Amino acid sequence: MTRNILIWPVLLALFAGCADTPVKPGNGEETLDQHLPLRLAVDMSPEDLALQTHNFYNLRAYYETYHWTEEGKLVRKAALTAFAPLVEQVLPREEMPEPDLIIKVRGRSVFNPMMQVWYVDVTATGYLPSGEEIASFKASSQVGGVLVFHEQALESTYVAAFQETGRKFLNSGTLSVVARQHSSD
C-alpha cells in the first residue's frame, strides 16, 4: 500500500513537464520553423487582454480549489510563442511601432473538471499596417488528463491551437506574399 502511495508523487514529477512539450507537425504538414523576413505584431483588444477566468478543480472529491487565471495575458503569451518560429521578430502590438503584419488574436477556453480536459478555440486575423484584412483562421485544441499544473496545461493548449493557425497562414501563402511585398519595398 505505501509503495502505491509513493509512486504518485514520482509520476506527477516526471510528467510535470509534458504540458510544455511543443506540438510536432504530422506527415505532409509544413514545419513552422520558417523565419520569414517579417516583423509581426500580435494584437488583442483591451477587453480580451484583461480577461480573467475562474476555474474549479476537483480531484476525485478529495481536493477542491478555485483558481483565477489571467487568461488574456496567457493567450497573448501563447500566440507570441507559437508565431515566433514563423518570422524574424514577434512582439506585442504596443511594443512594435512599424510592423509588416499585424495578427489580431482571440481565444476562449473551457475546462471540464470531471474529465480533466481543457478545450480551447482561437481566432487569428491578419492585417496589413494599412488596416486591410488579408486572412482569418480559426483552430481548436484540447489537452486531457490535467491533474496538476493547470495554467501550464492551458498555455500549451493555446500554443497548439495558435500553431495550427500558423500552419494555416503558411499553407494559404499569406505570409509568403506579405514577405515578398516587404522585401520589394
Question: What residue ranges belong to the model's regions?
Answer:
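Surface-exposed short loop/turn segments
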Residues: 19-27, 86-152
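Sec-dependent bacterial lipoprotein signal peptides
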Residues: 1-18
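Short secondary-structure boundary motifs at beta->alpha junctions and helix caps
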Residues: 60-68, 130-179
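Small side chains
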Residues: 9, 17, 124-126, 166
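Extended alpha-helical regions
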Residues: 1-2, 93-98, 182-185
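A structural "domain/chain start" motif
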Residues: 18-76, 174-185
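Extracytoplasmic/secreted envelope proteins and their assembly/folding machinery
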Residues: 72, 76-80, 84, 121, ...
